[in-house]
């Protein structure tokens, strides 16, 4: 699948409020078509060398550009600003949310409140899914920049991809160490909560067959407060934006960062211990049905 179609598919799968935060790949391709072919490459390089001798490399690159090329680069810079603003805002939000969830877990455990623990656990899984989406956001936008710059170099005869990507590697949206740490802390909270405090959902009093505890495949036959969970709740859960988006994001991350016969200096490293799509689905399935219905 071509990258443009893959990106569009990922944008559809992600959270609605995120959709305008991704790389404007179509707009960049339209701008690229306005740029003439790569003729005059030798003249371009000669002009760049003359300006570089008098000034800096950036001034030389700008001087060698046509107005259309300069417009393309301005759009690229605006895209970087967009990525960074959104990514930093989300990271700051996640730091606060992580602390709040840790405090809620501690309070609920102290009061031995199973209902509160269930609600918090559901929120933690949603939170984990959203952070995985942000990891995917970073990887997708980086990959899109690499691909559009390759097209630019091919069309214009310029060689800006390497210096521009070196600049990208220093941008906040690409620096995911803190995000990775938050994801791992979130997984540690889930590891702490999931093995214990499990509620059976096969009977009113919570004492059911243990073999059914991790099988939310038939919520309509389970009992909550003496009644069955409507099928609507099952549908709403299965269509959860977090679940669908997160599993799709993990598949995309695995594809983008997997080994390839065309590995280059621009390739992202393979995933390091992140959950697979199957593991993320399994994580969601571990949430008892009584929690799935509690939005």
Curated annotation (Swiss-Prot):
InterPro entries: SPX_dom, SPX_prot. Residues 199-227 are annotated as: Disordered. PROSITE patterns: SPX (PS51382). The keyword tRNA-binding does not apply. It is found in: Nucleus. Residues 204-216 have a biased composition (Basic and acidic residues). It holds the Pfam family SPX. Disruption phenotype: Slightly increased angles of leaf inclination due to longer lamina joint with greater lengths of both adaxial and abaxial sclerenchyma cells. The double mutant spx1 spx2 has abnormally inclinated leaves. Altered leaf inclination phenotypes of the rli1-1 single mutant are suppressed in the triple mutant spx1 spx2 rli1-1. Predominantly expressed in roots and leaves. Localized in leaves lamina joints. Keywords: Nucleus. One of its GO terms (cellular component) is nucleus. Residues 1-166 form the SPX domain. Induction: Up-regulated under phosphate (Pi) starvation in lamina joint cells. Up-regulated during cold stress. Under negative feedback regulation by PHO2. Up-regulated by the transcription factor PHR2. One of its GO terms (biological process) is cellular response to phosphate starvation. CDD domains: SPX_AtSPX1_like. PANTHER family: SPX DOMAIN-CONTAINING PROTEIN 2 (PTHR45978:SF5), SPX DOMAIN-CONTAINING PROTEIN 3 (PTHR45978). SPX1 and SPX2 have redundant functions in repressing the activity of PHR2. Interacts (via SPX domain) with PHR2 (via C-terminus). Interacts with RLI1 in the nucleus to prevents its positive regulation of leaf inclination during phosphate (Pi) starvation. The SPX domain is sufficient for inhibition of PHR2 binding to DNA. Involved in plant adaptation to phosphate (Pi) starvation. Inhibits PHR2 DNA-binding activity via a Pi-dependent protein interaction. Suppresses the regulation on expression of PT2 by PHR2 and accumulation of shoot Pi. Optimizes growth under phosphate-limited conditions through a negative feedback loop of the PSI (phosphate starvation-induced) signaling pathway. Regulates the expression of SPX2, SPX3 and SPX5. May be an important link between signal transduction pathways related to phosphate starvation and cold stress. This is SPX domain-containing protein 1. It comes from Oryza sativa subsp. japonica. The lineage of its organism: Eukaryota, Viridiplantae, Streptophyta, Embryophyta, Tracheophyta.
